[in-house]
Design a protein with these regions (language model features):
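Cysteine/selenocysteine-centered motifs that mediate thiol-based redox chemistry or coordinate metal-sulfur cofactors
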Residues: 105-106, 187-193
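A structural signal for short hydrophobic beta-strand segments in well-ordered beta-sheet cores
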Residues: 1, 48-49, 151
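A short, flexible beta-alpha/helix-coil linker loop
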Residues: 15-17, 107-108, 168-171
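Beta-hairpin "wing" of winged helix-turn-helix
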Residues: 1-5, 9
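A generic beta-sheet turn/junction motif
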Residues: 5, 52-54, 155
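Intrinsically disordered, low-complexity polar/acidic regions
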Residues: 110-111, 142
Length: 193
């Protein structure tokens, strides 16, 4: 509500959610079965998150049995500099788009482990591209880790979403490579559907 004239208007948050709903139409339906299979195999919570401008919107999750205190849930928005889902999307942005995003640094921190500087994020982009996945090591929630892989549009070659899985940080760190391989297999299955 605009208090000066008494009129109501929608905030930008509503527009972002509308955009996220639009991008999460039926083309993401094959991801649901993939996510449930990943969760059944790992016990971790898996997430499908869609890029919306300079943010990431979680559109689906398959709840694991280990942790129920994760920040990322359907409808929630996270920045691209925090968490495996956001940072993998940032890493696979075109260079010019990534640089535009990085111009907003330093970014707000969730805790002392959040990557907030241009230097930290550029190094993370390099590492993420090198290994093919982003690793969240308690950078959003203490005690929680995650691995995220990109989902790239087959036609444009641009990153449009990410598939990630999270759980207790020790388990994530110990299984990060096999978890990343499982997530990449999931992305291939989603894209083939």
């Amino acid at each position: 509500m605009d208090w000066s004239d008494g009129n109501y208007s929608l905030s930008l948050d509503w527009l972002r959610l509308a955009d996220a709903a639009r991008t999460s139409r039926t083309e993401w339906q094959p991801a649901i079965a993939v996510m449930h299979a990943i969760t059944a195999q790992t016990g971790m919570t898996s997430f499908l998150s869609v890029v919306s401008g300079t943010e990431l919107v979680c559109v689906e999750c398959a709840q694991g049995h280990a942790i129920d205190s994760l920040i990322l849930r359907p409808g929630r928005v996270l920045p691209l500099h925090a968490g495996a889902a956001g940072r993998v999307a940032l890493a696979y942005f075109e260079d010019a788009d990534a640089e535009r995003y990085l111009a907003g640094a330093p970014f707000p921190a969730y805790n002392e482990n959040t990557l907030v500087s241009v230097e930290q994020l550029r190094e993370d982009i390099r590492l993420t591209r090198e290994r093919g996945y982003a690793l969240s090591d308690e950078d959003v929630t203490l005690g929680v880790g995650a691995v995220g892989v990109p989902i790239v549009d087959n036609e444009s070659g641009r990153v449009i979403a990410s598939l990630s899985a999270g759980g207790f940080v020790d388990e994530v760190l110990a299984t990060q490579e096999s978890l990343a391989a499982l997530l990449h297999d999931g992305v291939h299955e989603i894209q083939a559907a």
